[in-house]
Amino acid sequence: MARFLLLLVAVAAAAAVLSLGDAAPSTAEVFWRAVLPESPLPDAFLRLLRPDTSFVVGKAEAAGGAARTGFPFDYTDYRGSDSPTTASGLDLAGDFGEPAPFGYDYSAQGEGGGGGAAAAAGEQVLAVDAGFNYDKYVGARKLRGGSSTAGGENDDEPFGYDYKAPSSGSGTAASTTARGVGTGATTTVFFHEEAVRVGERLPFYFPAATTSALGFLPRRVADSIPFTAAALPAVLALFGVAPDTAEAAGMRETLRTCEWPTLAGESKFCATSLEALVEGAMAALGTRDIAALASTLPRGGAPLQAYAVRAVLPVEGAGFVACHDQAYPYTVYRCHTTGPARAYMVEMEGDGGGDGGEAVTVATVCHTNTSRWNPEHVSFKLLGTKPGGSPVCHLMPYGHIVWAKNVKSSTA
C-alpha cells in the first residue's frame, strides 16, 4: 500500500506540473514532435497533456473522469448478443461467447438484414438530439448501476442505441429509432459515402468535449500503475474510488475490454500513455511512417446546425487504426484496426444555428466491407442496406483519432 500511496503522490505532482500550461513542453509532447514531425498534436491531446489544475482536487475528484455521460453512439461493435456487452463483446454479467475479429458477428447471415423502410441511398441518416459515442456499448446509466432496459428513461444517453442484435422480444423500433429527448432536433449518425462530397449538407450537433481527470500521465508513472483486472482493488484504493460506484464500474469495464485476447485477423491494444499510443499505432500499421488524423471541433461543442461540405481530402490507404478514449481516472485509449475502409478529412462550414457559422474539419471513416457485420446492426436498418452492401460511414468525434500510414491527401 505504501507503494501505491507514493504513486498517488507522483500522479498528483505530475498533473500539477503539467497544469502549468505552456511554460515547458512535457516529455510526451517532445516525443510526439520528434517521431511525428509532420503531424500536429491534436487539440484534445494538448488538453490531456496540460490538464487544468481544477482536475486535481483530491483522490475522489481525481477519479471523476471514469464514468462520463452523454455518449450515445458506438461505431465499433458489430456483433450480436442478447446481453449487454463491452467493447470486445464481453457480457457485463459474465463471459458468454467468443467475439469475432473486429467485433463482427460471424454467424450465418439471415434474410432481411437491410431494413427496407430506411433511408434511400445517398441520404444521411438522422437521429434525435444527441452527440457521438464510439466505444460505449451499454449506456452511461448502466455504468452508474442504473437500468439500461429498452424504452426506459435515460437522461444521459439521448439516442440510447445498443449496437448488438436485438433480442427476440425487443422488436425493431428500439434498435432502429432513436429515443427522443430535448428539442427533438436531428443530427447525422451514419451516412452513405455519396454524402462525402462538396456541396452536400449534413446536420450535426457536437457535444462539449470531456476528458479524463488527470489527462495523460507521464509514461514512467503510467507504467508503474498496474493495469490489470486482478489489480483493480489496489488501483481503486490508489485513486480513492469506492468499489460499488459508477467510476469503479467504468474502470472495470475498461480493464476487461483491454484484456480480451487478440483474435485472428485483428490488431488491437490499449495505451496508458501518449508514447504507448504512438508506438502501438506504428506496430499495428507495420511502419514508423504514420500520421494522426483527428477532427477539428470546438471544445465547447456546437449547437445543431446544417454543415455544408466545402472540401473533401481523401486519405490514401485501405486500412487504418482507430483509437477511442476509455473510462478511467487518467487517459487510456483503446485502439483497433478498422478492417477494409476509406478515410477522408472533410471540411465543413456551419450555417450558424443562431450562434454564427463555424468551420470544422471531421475525420471520416467509411467501412467498405460489411459482409461480416451483424445483419441486425442498426446502420443497415437506418441506411436501408445490408451486410456486403454499400459502405457505412461515420465521423470521429473530438478526442478520437485515426492513424494512417504513408498518408497523402488530395482535394476531391
UniProtKB/Swiss-Prot annotation:
Known glycosylation sites: 369
One GO-annotated biological process of the protein: pollen maturation
Pfam families, A to Z: BURP (PF03181)
Superkingdom of source: Eukaryota
Observed phenotype of the null mutant: Collapsed pollen with low viability. Almost no seed production.
Domain BURP: 190-406
Family annotation (InterPro entries): BURP, BURP_dom
Key words of the record: Glycoprotein, Signal
Span of the signal peptide: 1-23
Keyword Signal: yes
Tissue: Specifically expressed in anthers, in the tapetum and microspores (at protein level).
GO cellular component: exine
General function of this protein: Required for pollen development. Probably synthesized in the tapetum, packaged in Ubisch bodies and transported at appropriate stages to the micropsores.
PANTHER family: BURP DOMAIN PROTEIN USPL1-LIKE, BURP DOMAIN-CONTAINING PROTEIN 13
Protein name, as recorded: BURP domain-containing protein 13
Annotated organism of origin: Oryza sativa subsp. japonica (Rice)
Taxonomic lineage: Eukaryota, Viridiplantae, Streptophyta, Embryophyta, Tracheophyta
